[in-house]
Structure formats: structure tokens, C-alpha cells
Amino acid sequence: MTQLTLFQTARDHVSLVRMVKGKMRYYLLAIDYSLFGDCILEKIYGGMGNSKPTRVLREYYSSWIEAKERLEIVSQAKKKKGYKPLVTTI
């Protein structure tokens, strides 16, 4: 595992969207490190028109690899339910 200094961050994320009954829904998955070196998989989801997310869930893992594997599993499950990657152009 790579040791991070105070100002370095490692991050991995996936942004998914889908249309449900005429409304856009989003599902964000992000991996980040905690202050104690654990990896956190954060799942944030809700409706696009809402000012706050419907729910924010955090799962803690001892390694980046475990968190990344879980991110891939959740991402694939959401894609099976109709979520598609959010594509942005600059």
C-alpha cells in the first residue's frame, strides 16, 4: 500500500444517473481515506431536484482493494437496474 502524506489524497469515484417516472435520480460512489488510514466507500443517492441527498451511506474497509472491489460490485448492480454513467463534456 502506498503511504500518503498529509496533503495527498487518493480518490476513486463513479457517478450514475437514471430516469424514474419522469424524474432524474443519481447515485454517487466514492472511495476515500479516513484519518486513521481506513478506506471509506461512500454511497450518496437521491433525486436531481432535491436540495439534499436522500441518503448518505458509508462502509469502512481495511484496504483500498477491498473498497474498490465493493465499488465495482455496487456499480454493476446499479447498472443492471438501469443506471448509466454520467457523461460530461467540457
For the regions a language model picked out, list residue spans one by one.
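Short, mixed-charge low-complexity intrinsically disordered segments
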Residues: A77-I90
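A short, charged, amphipathic alpha-helix used as a generic interaction element across diverse proteins
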Residues: S51-P53, S62-K79
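Charged, amphipathic alpha-helical segments
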Residues: G22-L28
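Compact soluble domain cores
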Residues: M1-Q3, E69, L86
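Feature targets compositionally biased, intrinsically disordered low-complexity regions
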Residues: K21, Y45-G46, K81
